[in-house]
Amino acid sequence: PETLAIENQVNPDEIRRIVRDAQEKLFAARAQRVHPGTDYKLIMSWNGLMTRAFAEAACILDSDKYRQIAIANAQLVTSKMQATTPEGEHGWFRTYKDGRAHIDAFAEDYAAYANALISVYEATFDPEWLPIARSMIDSPISHFWDDKDAGFFSTSDYHETLVSRPKDFYDNAVPSANSEAAEALLRLYLLTANSEYETFALRIFQPFLPALGSAPTSFGRLLSAIDFYLSGPAEVALIGPFESDAMQDLVRATWQPYAPNKVVAGTEPKDNDATLDIPLLENRPMLHGKAAAYGCRD
């Protein structure tokens, strides 16, 4: 406004008044248009992408605000979107709106939210999230896996019968189910030492290796998962009282500056529940009564 006022030899407040009046007239004119329809439903896979982003941002930027957003979404999804399969097993719904969850989740929902919960665990070291993340991968292995040609079908074996079961490998605006699943499988393998997870991840890679060289832009997230595997990701275990300055310093040093391709686990010295399913934390004492960090690469 000041520059325009000088150029036109008027008071800056007059420029602001003109702009404000114009904005009000434009808004009034736009308000007369038919408003576009708005879809407020929650989609599990999209929320998985968002929750993971907030959880990782919380770690990298040391932001408790982002951490709380990730936790709140994880609590909402895991409490409101549970389902039961026809065999009576635990499953998930894809959408949630107005207090109602429905539509059986697709492979992309399971895979994206499994990755999200792994990241929420890394941001909080709360052991409750990893078993849920594991269940979100174990269920697709049982009900979505293609035993003949490898990879996850988009639909489960208890979805409605289709002419053919689709299988998505191409990464477009959002990652494919198989790309997300491959990364989740590799991360869980490092945290749990369950070699079956690594085996399934490598089987996902195998059929598409010939296509990666000719069309790499179609497999951006799959290539990221392959890079995660080939880089020999770091495994970091942090042991110490979570609220202590020493432990917080170790957490910050682990995440800053940003370096991808690692898994991070943490526990307090006497929290036996936190180590039950995480071999990375076993037999990791504090050193001389102080918080300690253990790191390794395969």
Where in this protein do the model-derived segments appear?
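Glycan-recognition and catalytic cores of secretory/periplasmic carbohydrate-active enzymes
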Residues: P1-D298
